[in-house]
């Protein structure tokens, strides 16, 4: 089995699908088992994980079934996004051994930034998260059986590596559809540079949501600096995360310049953490802007 990871894992304990995804081809045909709505919880110290089943995706030329990885954490505990930030390790889903599964796409809901306890910041989820899955079966006429080995780190007053083994038979008729759809709403939408998201529900937006207006590079002390202009509804809190074109890029977390809660915000970060011989000019970055009610993902090529 091979896995294609779209976002970087930081080599020095710093680590971002289109629409945020792992795409994992797997194989085999399912044996006769009853489809389920959810697996049993795998409960461990300070956390528990399970698989949940949803419905078939409508309007697709091929059969695609929704599912999800649900992780619960003790109050105040956290786990990590695909790019964990200054410290941490992202979840590592492995679907090898699944039956009647051609591929699995993992979607990543918008994360948040939090102190890592060592003077830096991590990126991830507090208390609870559902990672939506899109399952493509090998044989659309048969049900599928997911087998997931999930490695993930959790942190509270200490950090603990966790490994869960989960199984779930699915057929596109699961009862956890609403929970999965709610998580999918928070998955950043892919839009072009300068293009705003369509978020009529954002208060004060007038129907206009987030937009990343411009990205440019300028000389800095020791490293070039990237300047990102973000448009957002006035007073809406916004954060920004930056990822490189390959997993060995380890970009710093962007910082908001001058505070500001107006319709235009400026974020900056140094071009630090590049792999040896990497060229910044022409590199394609992935920028993710997140507010309380909206999230977008923008591919942006450096000048």
Model-predicted regions and their roles:
Residues 1-14:
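N-terminal secretory signal peptides that target proteins for export/translocation
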Residues 16-29:
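Bacterial N-terminal signal peptides
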Residues 6, 31-32:
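A subset of signal/propeptide-processing and intrinsically disordered low-complexity segments
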């Amino acid at each position: 089995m091979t896995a294609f990871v779209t976002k970087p894992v930081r080599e020095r304990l710093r680590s971002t699908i289109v629409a945020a995804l792992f795409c994992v081809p797997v194989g085999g045909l399912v044996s006769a088992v009853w489809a389920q709505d959810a697996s049993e919880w795998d409960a461990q110290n300070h956390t528990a994980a399970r698989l949940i089943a949803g419905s078939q995706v409508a309007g697709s030329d091929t059969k695609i079934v929704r599912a999800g990885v649900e992780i619960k954490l003790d109050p105040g505990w956290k786990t990590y996004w695909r790019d964990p930030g200054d410290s941490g390790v992202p979840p590592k889903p492995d679907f090898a051994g699944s039956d009647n599964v051609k591929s699995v796409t993992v979607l990543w809901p918008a994360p948040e930034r939090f102190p890592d306890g060592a003077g830096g910041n991590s990126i991830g989820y507090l208390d609870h998260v559902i990672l939506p899955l899109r399952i493509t079966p090998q044989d659309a006429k048969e049900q599928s059986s997911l087998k997931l080995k999930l490695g993930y780190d959790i942190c509270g007053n200490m950090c603990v590596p966790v490994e869960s083994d989960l199984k779930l038979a699915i057929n596109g008729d699961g009862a956890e559809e609403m929970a999965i759809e709610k998580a999918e709403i928070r998955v950043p939408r892919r839009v072009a540079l300068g293009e705003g998201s369509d978020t009529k529900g954002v208060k004060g937006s007038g129907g206009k949501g987030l937009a990343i207006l411009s990205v440019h590079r300028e000389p800095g002390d020791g490293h070039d600096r990237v300047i990102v202009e973000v448009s957002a509804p006035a007073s809406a809190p916004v954060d920004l995360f930056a990822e490189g074109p390959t997993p060995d890029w380890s970009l710093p977390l962007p910082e908001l310049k001058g505070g500001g809660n107006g319709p235009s915000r400026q974020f900056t970060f140094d071009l630090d953490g590049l792999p040896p011989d990497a060229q910044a000019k022409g590199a394609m970055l992935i920028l993710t802007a997140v507010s309380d009610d909206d999230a977008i993902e923008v591919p942006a090529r450096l000048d």
